[in-house]
Amino acid sequence: MHNSVQKNLNYKKYVIDSKLQYFKPHATKIEKTFAEEIRLSLTKNQKSIAPKFFYDKKGSALFEKICSLPEYYPTRTEIMILKKLQTELPDFLDHSFRLVELGSGASIKTRLLLDIFTKLQDRIDYFPIDISEILTESSEQLLADYDDLHITGIIDTYEGGLKFLQNFDDKKNLILFLGSSFGNFSPDDGYAFLQKINSAMKSGDLFLIGLDLVKDVQILESAYNDSQCVTAEFNLNVLSRINDELDADFDLINFKHHAIYNKEDQRIEMYLRSLVNQSVIISKSNLSLYLQKDELIHTEYSRKFQVSQIRELLTSVGFKIKNIWLDDGENFSLSLVSKN
């Protein structure tokens, strides 16, 4: 079956060694180019830059730094829950599961899940799905630390990777979507994303998703306006990336990080505020951009949820809720669901 998957879905297989292989589409229609997306998003009435563009090498390093900041509660509270799951999650698993992660990580969170699998299985199969080829780098770090680990990476969109997995074999999957990335979706896009996950799941598969919870406004706003200004640097770095990769002339001194909590829509809204009237050339996007003083470029939404809303959302998509875990302070949640 594995050979037919490669042929039918036009994937090329790369074998690194006996424990590491990955699949990559021969050709992909997955995304417009960076230049095209930037041109389209910066010519709308509400100018925006998609949050996926934060994560170049420097942006990824800054985000790792954000995760350890005292004000940034999501990472440490999710880790607290994952530690709790060391004894509770095995009740829902058996030796026939493999671990599938949307995104690739050598982080402590991925390792906490792998630790659970080491207690259940002699051989652990881990399938990270990530559009970035950093996937191979993080995989090698994990293989160095887990003797019984075998990794099959899929370098594709989440949707493409899950379709690939559907046709790969009949093994049961525990699919992870950790962190609070789901909160970056609009309500409609988030619902559509969950529908795609649900339709890609087989009977017996499980899905574990992290969702940030509604809480005190001061806690929320402090998490995105840290005292060391790392989040501000992270936000501004996307302009540096556009300068470097798209031959643009953004002057970062003329922009300021701006993050507020929108209580009505239950979301943090992150922007770059123009401090002056200014013109910017983005050569590779064939764009001449004019920004007025105080005009905002939207860079990220991060939606927050009530537990009742999580239940309603997941069941409305067609999931059966197995369990919802919270940290002791009820700041963050991990929900385990199956296909109904």
Predicted feature descriptions by range:
Residues 2-52, 60:
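N-terminal auxiliary segments of SAM/dcSAM-dependent transferases
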